[in-house]
Amino acid sequence: MSILNVLLSTDQLVVTVDTWAEDAVSGQASAGAKVLLIPQHQILLATRGSAQFFLRIYQLSLEASFRADFTLEQLTAELGRVIDQLWPNYAKAVAEAGLPAEYCTTELVLGGWSPKSGRMMATAYAKHDAAEPAVVQPITGQLSSPGEPLQDWPPSMATPDLFEAGRRQAQWLNERSGRKVAGGRLLLGFLQQGQAVVKDLGAI
């Protein structure tokens, strides 16, 4: 699994993810893009879980962003249904590849600037079971996944604190799994009105 953290204020959105990725069949390690921008609208998508599923969601969201009537609110409302519609084919592909059911899981965050509301907005989506609809949860201040290693760590948008939080999470996940499942480099997605930036904070 991966690292996915979100800090939200009225005028700023900060997301951090790790870059550790591995091929589900061969196990070969690589670096993955788990936070991607829709920069013309100051919007980002980030993930913890299946990279292939995330890239499909990003592709559809990016295509939608070209519509003349596009709004963050509309994409936010549609995304849960889109996840549910795509899930059967994804689950089928996982089964046909002979992969364990644990690969059928995704956590996504959609966030960005809302001209309509005059503030930053973010929503979390989770899907684990084809029989149940995607869980959709508005983010009001913060989200940490995994949250266990940060129970005693106060939320902060300061870069050193974001880096330390990611380092703690990667260490916790790797120790819990008995192998490397998180790490690589820590990427930071930063949004404010008129600005959409991704920064590399370094190796964790």
Regions found by a protein language model. Name each.
Residues 2-92, 129-204:
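Conserved short S/T/G-enriched processing/targeting/catalytic segments and their helical context
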